[in-house]
């Protein structure tokens, strides 16, 4: 598929263009222009082999657009494997399918599963199982693919085809095919352990090994033992599918090749000091120097980097003047609204009258590795990094870190360049780094994450023996013990490891356990309206916009919202102001606030409100004029995050309670003083240890709200214990005096 070269980014033109003898060609001799017969064309919309022109899903005539899309579908590599797939599905309960990205598996296999389900239902009395579910590891993919498949089936999105993601459902009574995040299907299983309404379960992108996918696979193995009528399809884009095949009792494996063209791979001769700078430089070079028409796909690690790159590339292109071709920069990350996500499928701008080539440049997180296929991409830029969760159970710190990708991810990224014509992949790292420093496969998320949410969900599902749960890769016992300890301190499970009534209620919220506990407790403290808003703001990316060229103005704008007690209450001020200004985008722009983030937070708040209403949790507020208004909110924060507190030592440094980690307040905090006790939302590992999103709290609240955790008899010696002991003695004296 590729040949390897060295990439010259200093403009000297001295790049090494040696072909690697170890790289073998993966180009295929498949014809890209197979035509279909008229008979097959008429059959495709039918259930079974009847040649009909009526859509069987809505009883409407097929549109002209349907047939135009059908022509493209019939060219997909997976198309010729339909009969083989249907045969395997009829004769087996589980199937493993390997299909390279772009083979069409994500859009076609679920449609064929619906067709299979309809065939099975003919002549049968109506049953519960009338749905096909296809899981995706990312919400962007679930929404985007559902939109595409609704077009292919000539139905309305949200009717026969829909999607379900955290905080948003787009389905109806008519839905027969549902794309959903793996986390949403797992949440459904909590209330329906056998997933009775589903006839076919499809786990797509299983190779990504997300937490939810790994738990789902264990649950599905149990469901298969109890439901002979259910069918399961495990789909992967990598050749590591043998592991999935063995896990599911050596089920049949169907391999579908992609249609790939040769891809030249370029490495940098030396390591890049600033991969973002190198990536932007490479985009401009490709656009100006490459004579082949084709779009660019750049992989970056997150929203902030992507937005920054888009701005800088736009500025550079404008500076080149009208003689340069147009370059349309399109961001892609998980929190983009659906309409913005669909821009990646738009064509590139037209070429200039002077012949200069115009292109689009999609700048994406690793969602574009396998979850979405973007036609027209000829040039891929791979800096070699992605954001990954990393958890240290000994100090109970989970951080989202920028980490090197695996070789498997690098190969997937390179493959995006060879979808429609021969392409090029520019790797912004050395060939030596690729060969000796990158892991072969991405480490499964279950081996590097805090398992608090997972254990809570498993307990809700009735799993008693966590140690012997059928994990594909069992997590370390220490990580499981830390999760059980967390849930016990939060009173979600009792000392025998059994789920409490509070824990059962916490599991109903699509939130981390600490946030769920905080939200539930806030009803008793008469501040659930405010905690709803804070929880929503903590569940979305940072709302602050801080452009390099306007940092002073952005910081001044942020200071206008600052609350003296810290960042959580500052976020509450921002949300209140956003609503008071009628959710005005111009107000957001003027105040350096991300409008998309605020709209997402508002949606999250609405969904959480519905969960509260469903379980009769009061939505209340303390009188704003009362001195207890902010005190109650801060106490509610402590109810959820009492384990995430740092104490200011005599040395002037902060030390985390119990774990004794030296930390600093993050520079982004609005606090203009150093509180003695600081509750934090996030532990950030960079060149230093930082705590981010911080609020000033009182030590007596820690002792009163979480006495089990702050049992001073079991506390490590040190300045923190001495201070808390003094506070405890004061509380006891006051109690004795009847205060």
Swiss-Prot record:
EC number: 3.6.4.13
Sites where the protein binds ATP: 99-106
A GO biological-process term: RNA splicing
This protein's GO CC annotations: spliceosomal complex
Annotated keywords: ATP-binding, Helicase, Hydrolase, mRNA processing, mRNA splicing, Nucleotide-binding, Nucleus
Name this protein carries in UniProt: Pre-mRNA-splicing factor ATP-dependent RNA helicase ddx-15
InterPro entries in alphabetical order: DEAD-box_helicase_OB_fold (IPR011709), DEAD/DEAH_box_helicase_dom (IPR011545), DHX15_DEXHc (IPR044756), HA2_WH (IPR048333), Helicase-assoc_dom (IPR007502), Helicase_ATP-bd (IPR014001), Helicase_C-like (IPR001650), P-loop_NTPase (IPR027417)
Domain Helicase ATP-binding stretches: 86-257
Coiled-coil annotated residue ranges, if any: none
Record-annotated Helicase C-terminal domain positions: 282-462
Region (Disordered): 1-49
Subcellular location: Nucleus
Matching PROSITE patterns: HELICASE_ATP_BIND_1, HELICASE_CTER
